[in-house]
UniProtKB/Swiss-Prot annotation:
A lipid is attached at residues 552, 559, 562 (S-palmitoyl cysteine). Belongs to the influenza viruses hemagglutinin family. Palmitoylated. In natural infection, inactive HA is matured into HA1 and HA2 outside the cell by one or more trypsin-like, arginine-specific endoprotease secreted by the bronchial epithelial cells. One identified protease that may be involved in this process is secreted in lungs by club cells. This is Hemagglutinin. Residues 1-526 are extracellular. It comes from Influenza A virus (strain A/Mallard/Astrakhan/244/1982 H14N6). The chain crosses the membrane at residues 527-547.
């Protein structure tokens, strides 16, 4: 047992570096609790630091800057364009985003728009309700018809941008044949309509003819509508309806109105600009006094992250919508928390075994022990090399994904339900595809980050090993035992790459000669261990046998052998 203890003590002195030689260890930064990220091969890799790429927070209001907002309040965009009562304040307004409220209501004669979404999109993208009034000559009819369903100031009225034509005082109606040429330099939008009476009597009372017809033509298009006469559920005490149509007239083209009854005529046109990127947003959020480049139906997003999980409907300079609530991009190396009571300084060994939680001013660094004491220093060069690669990658990732993203809501009439289903399928597929691509892209970047940081650690280790050469011995755990006196200046030269092994070569060789014989003879340790173990077992067995014989002689144990 004494021999075993002596051999173990001698071996511990050699392996723990208590020979008095200087030791320098290479290490990397670590934290007590790292962040888990996904890579191509592992769903949970702990790293020192990571950046969240998905924005999940938003303000509960719409910011009117830098995007100019127009609040429709009780009026939607179509009613504003038609000039419904209560919507007059919207005339000639301009916007980047027109805010439609879910509480908006129709306030005039009940109407429908067969191509509602297209008209809404054209008006929204034009960015204004700039109306140009025109003089029309409607011969043989009575103009400025009104309805009790369309009260303005307590009196019967009508859509301010439309002219309801009925039979003249002599009882006749037209016929109408009016032409307007677009002599301007912009596209004109004409709104017009067809009245569908609730009965044959109403038809003849208003238009004399039993069956009316409206035809509107341009060089490239023509539409002809015959009214559908019949009773419908009453809306604002009216069972008749008006269908609203629209026509775009390019510069140099003309629009022709032909009718023998039931025409709801225009009073002018809207100036359409194709150079703007304005839009419409339906939301119940109030307009605040904040600033945000990104609006959603749920509020504003103020973030520099490349992705968001707030809403599919996003307008402005917005992060892309993804289905994932979190995508963590590694911005630091693999985290290996430090082990306790082991290695240099009684606590920490080199990078192969664990990281250093105390290395706060760099990712990679050195710790040493010599005659002057102990010390720690970061290696800024390798740290900066890794940071540059990671930051460059982060900037490229944000640049790729944080482009202007514009997704507006889609609306369809019930008769277009199949189109709505198809549109929803396409949008869902696009989101699924982009969400998958985003997750794959982040996993690729995380894999590369970890590989880069591991590579920089290995580069630093190889640089030190090539400097020291035969003047030191690799202990296999990220540390080197130096076989010559190495003060703090010497340690610093190893760290900064100016170490000259030739200066210390002779001293290191002499010290190796003194140490190696002792080290080589330590091979007897295994022999002593086995001999000690065998002798201990022999003594233990002999003691047991002696006790049994003594007990048998005193009658305490009786042995019977049966054959």
């Amino acid at each position: 047992l004494v021999a075993l203890a002596l051999s173990q003590t001698a071996y511990s002195q050699i392996t723990n570096g208590t020979t008095g030689n200087p030791i320098i260890c290479l290490g990397h930064h670590a934290v007590e609790n790292g962040t888990s990220v996904k890579t191509l091969t592992d769903n949970h890799v702990e790293v020192v630091s990571a950046k969240e790429l998905v924005e999940t927070k938003h303000t509960d209001e719409l910011c009117p800057s830098p995007l100019k907002l127009v609040d429709g309040q009780d009026c939607d965009l179509i009613n504003g364009a038609l000039g419904s009562p209560g919507c007059d304040r919207l005339q000639d307004t301009t916007w980047d985003v027109f805010i439609e409220r879910p509480t908006a209501v129709d306030t005039c004669y009940p109407f429908d728009v067969p191509d509602y979404q297209s008209l809404r999109s054209i008006l929204a993208s034009s960015g204004s309700l700039e109306f140009i009034a025109e003089q029309f000559t409607w011969n043989g009819v009575k103009v400025d018809g009104s309805s009790s369903a369309c009260l303005r100031g307590g009196r019967n009225s009508f859509f301010s941008r439309l002219n309801w034509l009925t039979k003249a005082t002599n009882g006749n109606y037209g016929p109408i044949n009016v032409t307007k040429e677009n002599t301007g330099s912009y596209v004109r939008l004409y709104l017009w309509g067809v009245h569908h009476p609730s009965s044959d009597n109403e038809q003849t009372d208003l238009y004399k003819v039993a069956t009316g017809r409206v035809t509107v033509s341009t060089r490239s298009d023509q539409i002809s509508i015959v009214p559908n006469i019949g009773s419908r559920p009453r809306v604002r005490n009216q069972s008749g309806r008006i269908s609203i149509y629209w026509t775009l007239v390019n510069p140099g083209d003309s629009i022709i109105f032909n009718s023998i009854g039931n025409l709801i005529a225009p009073r002018g046109h809207y100036k359409i600009s194709k150079s703007t990127k304005s839009t419409v947003l339906k939301s119940d959020k109030r307009i605040g006094s904040c600033t945000s480049p990104c609006l959603t139906d749920k509020g504003s997003i103020q973030s520099d992250k490349p992705f968001q999980n707030v809403s599919r409907i996003a307008i402005g300079n917005c992060p892309k919508y993804v289905k994932q609530g979190s995508l963590m991009l590694a911005t630091g190396m693999r985290n290996i928390p430090g082990k306790q009571a082991k290695g240099l300084f009684g606590a920490i060994a080199g990078f192969i075994e664990n990281g250093w939680q105390g290395l706060i001013d760099g990712w990679y660094g050195f710790r040493h022990q010599n005659a002057e004491g102990t010390g720690t220093a970061a290696d800024l060069k390798s740290t900066q090399a890794a940071i540059d690669q990671i930051n460059g990658k982060l900037n490229r990732l944000i640049e790729k994904t944080n482009e202007k993203y514009h997704q507006i809501e889609k609306e369809f009439e019930q008769v277009e339900g199949r189109i709505q289903d198809l549109e929803k399928y396409v949008e869902d597929t696009k989101i699924d595809l982009w969400s998958y691509n985003a997750e794959l892209l982040v996993a690729l970047e995380n894999q590369h980050t970890i590989d880069v940081t591991d590579s920089e650690m290995n580069k630093l280790f190889e640089r030190v090993r090539r400097q020291l050469r035969e003047n030191a011995e690799d202990q296999g755990n990220g540390c080197f035992e130096i076989f010559h006196q190495c003060d703090n200046n010497c340690i610093e030269s190893i760290r900064n790459g100016t170490y000259d092994h030739n200066i210390y070569r002779d001293e290191a060789i002499n010290n190796r000669i003194k140490i190696n014989p002792v080290t080589l003879t330590m091979g007897y340790k295994d022999i002593i261990l086995w001999i000690s173990f065998s002798m201990s077992c022999f003594v233990f067995v002999a003691l047991i046998l002696g006790f049994v014989l003594w007990a048998c002689q005193n009658g305490n144990i009786r042995c019977q052998i049966c054959i």
